Amino acid sequence: MKLLIDFFPIILFFVAFKVWGIYTATAVAIVATIAQIAYLRVRHGKVEPMQWVSLGVIVLFGGATLLAHNDTFIKWKPSVLYWLMGSALLIGQLVFRKNLLRSVMGAQLQLPDNAWRTLNWSWAAFFAVMGALNLVIAYRFDTDTWVNFKLFGGMGLMLVFVIGQAIYMSRFMQEDKGEAAAATPDALPPPGVQQDKQP
């Protein structure tokens, strides 16, 4: 259900584009994102900071697209959002000495410090590349190709990257399990058999 809510605006944007075109799709994306935030606020009582940022970006660039009747603005929106997320990770690490990924996922994942740093840098680099790739597609191909990439290409690359990150993290989880097993005391003797007592 959460995954559906997360992709709700982009799916509606894609459908609206195929039926009515880029400008109607942009308006639909704005309304859908506002509805998404309202639902999260009412249902869960909390909206993540990046979701507020996403709302601000779609309203700003989507609104500019509709007012200027120029789809260049909406095509820049994904790149700006990617770069904002990447910048947040870098600023947190370099300026505030705080790993934002660890702050978000540290309760669910037990990883060494070097693994968290690698993940943080990897995600920042991924967001930088995705932002640049979005503009390459936007300026070198037609709008229909860009919209298809936005839904299928972007999601596909994200999925591949997440799988790669999961494989990387699994190495450390296996090491933790091995260390825990090595630290486990020897099994108790069968019933009726006493262990030798030290004098």
From Swiss-Prot:
It is found in: Cell inner membrane. The keyword Transmembrane helix applies. The keyword Chaperone does not apply. It is a multi-pass membrane protein. The chain crosses the membrane at residues 3-23, 47-67, 76-96, 119-139, 149-169. InterPro entries: YciB (IPR006008). GO terms for cellular component: plasma membrane. Keywords: Cell inner membrane, Cell membrane, Membrane, Transmembrane, Transmembrane helix. Residues 180-199 are annotated as: Disordered. Plays a role in cell envelope biogenesis, maintenance of cell envelope integrity and membrane homeostasis. PANTHER family: INNER MEMBRANE-SPANNING PROTEIN YCIB, INTRACELLULAR SEPTATION PROTEIN A-RELATED. Belongs to the YciB family. This is Inner membrane-spanning protein YciB. It comes from Delftia acidovorans (strain DSM 14801 / SPH-1).
